A protein has these predicted regions:
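Catalytic active-site module of serine/aspartate enzymes centered on a nucleophile-bearing elbow/loop
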Residues: 214-250
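Active-site loop/oxyanion-hole signature of alpha/beta-hydrolase fold enzymes
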Residues: 20, 32-75, 79, 237-238
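Conserved loop-alpha-helix segment in the C-terminal half of the alpha/beta-hydrolase fold
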Residues: 23, 192-224, 230
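Conserved alpha/beta-hydrolase catalytic His-Asp/Glu region
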Residues: 98, 130-188
């Protein structure tokens, strides 16, 4: 029976960002796709629980246990990559593959000053569906996500933008993401870690060696952006399969 592989999306997205790679994983892994608390169809964390990467990971671990899965391989993109790394630290992941993970910067980002882009997005929400049907407009809207936004279908692009606008867990998770950093020191050596960075990722730069867990396998994914599942589904699928095939240390 294939080994379980949990896929975790990034900030403002939902599990559907993995749709392009799912057919390529079929039969190779028992794929589990969950929305993080406060995103997609998932309820936010309880009041008073800060939506840090570690706490989001704890919620996803509990959801996996409810499905009879104790320790899946875990792969995540952006904030989801950081969540996956925290699941590995806690002993809840057989391996971790993090694609352009957040949190590996050297110091907390702090809150971004200036205009609230999501507030503007909410005002423009009625126009999103029509805008994503116009290829040049769709490419402009989605250029943050992908190196080749023209490869993102209109329906998927609309879902990406509306998910970012509507996610009730966005503000809290974004605030926590900008307040904390990932700490690589003391990371369990028995958890294989792969960090893959998109060559054309303009949101998150490649982490310095000192910011990665010891023994991390680091890859540069050519000709893809921050959320590369539409840029090159085959490359992403191979990266996930290879990362989840590395045997854990005994």
């Amino acid at each position: 029976m294939p080994e379980p592989l949990l896929l975790i999306h990034g900030l403002g997205a939902s599990g559907t960002v993995w749709d392009p790679v799912l057919p390529l994983l079929e039969g190779e892994r028992e794929v589990v796709v969950l929305d993080m608390p406060g995103f997609g169809t998932a309820s936010p964390l309880p009041d008073g629980v800060e939506p840090t990467a570690a706490n989001l990971g704890a919620a996803l671990h509990a959801a996996c246990v409810d499905r009879g899965i104790e320790r899946p391989h875990v792969a995540g993109n952006s904030l989801g990559g950081w969540v996956g790394l925290e699941m590995g630290r806690a002993g809840w992941a057989a391996s971790v593959t993090a694609i352009s993970p957040a949190g590996l910067w050297r110091a907390p980002l702090g809150q971004r000053p200036g205009r609230d882009a999501r507030a503007l997005g909410r005002r423009l929400r009625p126009l999103v569906a029509a805008a994503t049907l116009v290829p040049p407009v769709r490419r402009r809207m989605l250029s943050t996500f992908a190196a080749h936004p023209e490869r993102i279908p209109a329906a998927a692009g609309r879902e990406l933008v509306l998910g970012w606008i509507d996610a009730n867990g966005y503000d809290g998770a974004n605030r926590a993401m900008r307040t904390h950093i990932f700490e690589p020191d003391g990371y369990p050596e028995e958890v294989p870690v792969t960090i893959a960075w998109g060559e054309h990722d303009h949101l998150v730069g490649p982490p310095k060696p000192a910011r990665r867990p010891a023994g991390t396998r680091f890859l540069v994914l050519p000709d893809v952006g921050h959320t590369p599942m539409w840029d090159d589904p085959g490359l992403v699928a191979r990266t996930l399969l290879e990362g989840s095939a590395i045997p854990a240390a005994l």
